[in-house]
Design a protein with these regions (language model features):
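Oxyanion-hole/transition-state-stabilizing segment in secreted/luminal serine hydrolases
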Residues: 1-31, 53-57
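Charged helix-capping and loop-helix junction motifs
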Residues: 28-35, 73
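An active-site-proximal structural segment forming one wall of the substrate-binding cleft
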Residues: 5-6, 39, 79-83
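Extracellular/periplasmic catalytic domains that process cell-envelope and extracellular macromolecules
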Residues: 7-10, 42, 128
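A generic local structural motif
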Residues: 1-3, 34-35, 77-78
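Catalytic His-Asp segment of secreted/periplasmic serine-dependent ester chemistry enzymes
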Residues: 55-140
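Active-site segments of SGNH/GDSL-like serine hydrolases
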Residues: 15-21, 37-74
Length: 140
């Protein structure tokens, strides 16, 4: 019965986004997304995969932590984006942020903090990512 209630005319956009914590499991993510895609498409969902976004490696390393390299993020985005390409549309926020800049701070809660962890974005950057995705959805 629930299947009958989904709109035939206007699909629901579903955007998947992963963080930078787990690049070693990219093939597990691909399998999982491929596994759930058919079920979501039956519910008239249009599927999108948003890129893993850049980090400020210099800040992370300055804090004495291991930073994921931009090359690893680009490879992850390329492999996952290509594997899902026939079912998911790819929203390349990574390139957008690299071209237009981004800010990081320690918060990640929507309230900016004076400290920076190089990983979480400023409120302004999160809003820019959100707007970029909305603009992408309007065009696609």
């Amino acid at each position: 019965i629930a299947e009958e209630n989904y709109s035939v005319l206007k699909p629901t956009a579903v955007i998947f986004n992963l963080g930078v914590n787990d690049p070693g499991n990219m093939y597990d993510y691909i399998s999982y997304y491929q596994e759930i895609a058919e079920s979501l498409q039956k519910k008239n969902c249009k599927l999108f995969f948003m890129s893993v976004n850049p980090v400020n490696s210099k800040t992370i390393e300055y804090l004495g932590k291991n930073a994921i390299r931009k090359e690893v993020i680009r490879k992850f985005n390329s492999v996952v984006g290509s594997a899902l390409g026939s079912t998911f549309e790819y929203i390349d926020t990574y390139s957008y942020l690299m071209e237009n800049g981004y800010g990081t701070n320690i918060s990640g809660t929507g309230v900016d903090m004076p400290d920076d962890d190089g990983l979480h974005y400023t409120t302004k950057t999160y809003k820019r990512i959100f707007k970029y995705c909305l603009d992408y959805l309007i065009l696609h």
